């Protein structure tokens, strides 16, 4: 390794969902603003190989990387904050670690030795930490450990990072512990005892946190910080408060004000420039001072859990920022949409978005919403299954193919306008077997897509098995559907549009996965702009 890579490990205590991922992403942004190169990864303690086959209700969105890895939604936060494309090495599960070790044992690679958690599992974990640093040759690798201190599942990861401190030298490792300082309204007090016990548990397995980041709804007084420092064996200046923020992108500035990035640089001996947060400060200012407002209906099947569509939501906000517009999302459960009530449900919106998903639940409601948007000239954006539903709707209601459907959702359909990709027909396993990752797409002239991308060839991330059926291509084109983008060989349809409509675009890929606050995705910029003009 040409650089003396430093390692920051972020753990969490007391309760889950404290924002370890946002803390890690925010630190990455701050270190980049100091001129350092950074990569981030997450270790998840569950035994699934990856989250690709998990229900969104269990895990939220599955975030797909350029190299086709199906990963934790926190990788989306990482990419959006540090503006770097991550890889499969940035998300590792217990399942993947155990699988790799057991596979080696079956091949006889351990020479008949007894395979144990220590050293075999812990060494495999350590290898994956170092792999990220080697892959990018970065100054700092930030690793988030999923789960909560005290969970049995996390112990091998914690033991591995404890060992890394001694493998690479304590001057090259910084431990950050994110914890909760709850406020009891009746007593009018902040309580530090949960933090004390969490750190005690962490220290009992050999890890002394260097910095404690305290989530709280109330400001921590200097006395509270001193108390936490006293019982947790750190200086009060190393206790950082992280108050609830108005929006995610304000968190890096809040943590910088508390001195988090300065402390990390000091502890790791990082010679870095003074921080330049000017661009980020300007972006946060613009987010909080938007001039216009537009309302977008998001019609999906997992709308009860907004994390299932978190990248779509963020991409809409990025598109709004580019248009100086606050995007209000109207969450519509696709199962509730019928031909009888669609006008009532959608009449107050300026645009309709149908995101990706799997399975037939709610599909007819999505198709109704798409019909309404097409017939009422409302800006529409369809993503993945949203594009497939748009093709089905057009085939049924414009081309007149009654019963047209996807062979995935109705194997008996007389008109399978969406069908299984030929290379998928003999695939039996579900995990990691779809068309995944970054693929090129050739755009056609005189289309919405060509206008917003301003490019002939684009690269987008995919996650699907089913595709536009070319047997119906000529019929659909002749009836007015525009094929706006295809694979370079012209075989796979990637983008479709409707003529004589202010904005009707549907794409097979997932544009939301490449949108960044400082570089909003052009499709979302165009869609939000069209919705704003439609008011």
From Swiss-Prot:
CTP binds at residues 16, 151-153, 191-196, 227. Pfam families: CTP_synth_N, GATase. It catalyses: UTP + L-glutamine + ATP + H2O = CTP + L-glutamate + ADP + phosphate + 2 H(+); L-glutamine + H2O = L-glutamate + NH4(+); UTP + NH4(+) + ATP = CTP + ADP + phosphate + 2 H(+). One of its GO terms (molecular function) is CTP synthase activity. The keyword Magnesium applies. Allosterically activated by GTP, when glutamine is the substrate; GTP has no effect on the reaction when ammonia is the substrate. The allosteric effector GTP functions by stabilizing the protein conformation that binds the tetrahedral intermediate(s) formed during glutamine hydrolysis. Inhibited by the product CTP, via allosteric rather than competitive inhibition. Pathway: Pyrimidine metabolism; CTP biosynthesis via de novo pathway; CTP from UDP: step 2/2. GO terms for biological process: 'de novo' CTP biosynthetic process; pyrimidine nucleobase biosynthetic process. Mg(2+) binds at residues 74, 144. Residues 1-270 are annotated as: Amidoligase domain. L-glutamine binds at residues 57, 357, 385-388, 408, 465. InterPro entries: Class_I_gatase-like, CTP_synthase, CTP_synthase_N, GATASE, GATase1_CTP_Synthase, P-loop_NTPase. The active site is at residues 384, 510, 512. Its EC number is 6.3.4.2. CTPSs have evolved a hybrid strategy for distinguishing between UTP and CTP. The overlapping regions of the product feedback inhibitory and substrate sites recognize a common feature in both compounds, the triphosphate moiety. To differentiate isosteric substrate and product pyrimidine rings, an additional pocket far from the expected kinase/ligase catalytic site, specifically recognizes the cytosine and ribose portions of the product inhibitor. Catalyzes the ATP-dependent amination of UTP to CTP with either L-glutamine or ammonia as the source of nitrogen. Regulates intracellular CTP levels through interactions with the four ribonucleotide triphosphates. Belongs to the CTP synthase family. Homotetramer. This is CTP synthase. It comes from Clostridium perfringens (strain 13 / Type A). The lineage of its organism: Bacteria, Bacillati, Bacillota, Clostridia, Eubacteriales. The gene is pyrG.
């Amino acid at each position: 390794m040409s650089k003396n890579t430093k390692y920051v490990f972020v753990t969490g205590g007391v309760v889950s969902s404290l924002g370890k991922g946002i803390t890690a992403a925010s630190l990455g942004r701050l270190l980049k603003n100091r001129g350092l190169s950074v990569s981030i990864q997450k270790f998840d303690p569950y035994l699934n190989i990856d989250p690709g086959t998990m229900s969104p209700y269990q895990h939220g969105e599955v975030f797909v990387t350029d190299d086709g890895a199906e990963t934790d939604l926190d990788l989306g936060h990482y990419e959006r904050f540090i503006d770097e494309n991550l890889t499969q090495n940035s998300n590792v599960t217990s399942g993947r670690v155990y699988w790799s070790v057991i596979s080696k044992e079956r091949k006889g690679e351990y020479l008949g030795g007894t395979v144990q958690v220590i050293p075999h599992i812990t060494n495999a974990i350590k290898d994956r930490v170092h792999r990220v640093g080697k892959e990018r040759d970065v100054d700092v690798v930030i690793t988030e450990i999923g789960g909560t201190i005290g969970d049995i599942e996390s112990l091998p990861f914690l033991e591995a990072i404890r060992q890394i401190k001694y493998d690479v030298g304590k001057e090259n490792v910084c431990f950050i512990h994110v914890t909760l300082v709850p406020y009891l309204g009746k007593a009018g007090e902040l309580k530090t005892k949960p933090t004390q016990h969490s750190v005690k548990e962490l220290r009992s397995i050999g890890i002394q946190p260097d910095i404690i980041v305290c989530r709280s709804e109330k400001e921590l007084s200097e006395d509270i910080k001193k108390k936490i420092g006293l019982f947790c064996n750190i200086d009060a200046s190393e206790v950082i408060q992280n108050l609830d923020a108005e929006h995610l992108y304000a968190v890096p500035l809040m943590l910088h004000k508390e001195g988090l990035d300065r402390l990390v640089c000091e502890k790791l001996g990082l010679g870095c420039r003074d921080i330049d947060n000017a661009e980020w400060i300007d972006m946060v200012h613009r987010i909080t001072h938007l001039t216009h407002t537009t309302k977008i209906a998001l019609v999906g099947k997992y709308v009860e859990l907004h994390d299932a569509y978190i990248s779509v939501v963020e991409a809409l906000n990025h598109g709004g920022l580019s248009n100086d517009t606050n995007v209000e999302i109207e969450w519509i459960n696709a199962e509730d949409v019928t031909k009888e009530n669609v006008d009532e449900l959608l009449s107050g919106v300026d645009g309709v978005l149908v995101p990706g998903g799997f399975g037939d639940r709610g599909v007819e409601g999505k198709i109704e919403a798409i019909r309404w948007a097409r017939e009422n000239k409302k800006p529409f954006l369809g993503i993945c299954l949203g594009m497939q539903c748009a093709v089905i709707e057009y085939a049924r209601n414009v081309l007149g193919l009654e019963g047209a459907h996807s062979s995935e959702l109705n194997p008996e359909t007389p008109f399978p306008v969406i069908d299984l990709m030929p290379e998928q027909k003999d695939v039996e396993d579900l995990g990691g077997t779809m068309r995944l990752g970054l693929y090129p797409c050739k755009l056609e002239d005189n289309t919405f897509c060509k206008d917003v991308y301003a490019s002939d060839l684009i690269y987008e991330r995919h996650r699907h098995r089913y595709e536009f059926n070319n047997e119906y291509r000529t019929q659909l084109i002749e009836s007015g559907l525009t094929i706006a983008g295809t694979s370079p060989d012209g075989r796979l349809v990637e983008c479709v549009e409707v003529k004589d409509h202010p904005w009707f675009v549907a794409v097979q890929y997932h544009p939301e996965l490449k949108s960044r606050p400082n570089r909003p995705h052009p499709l979302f910029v165009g869609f939000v702009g069209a919705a704003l003009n439609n008011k």
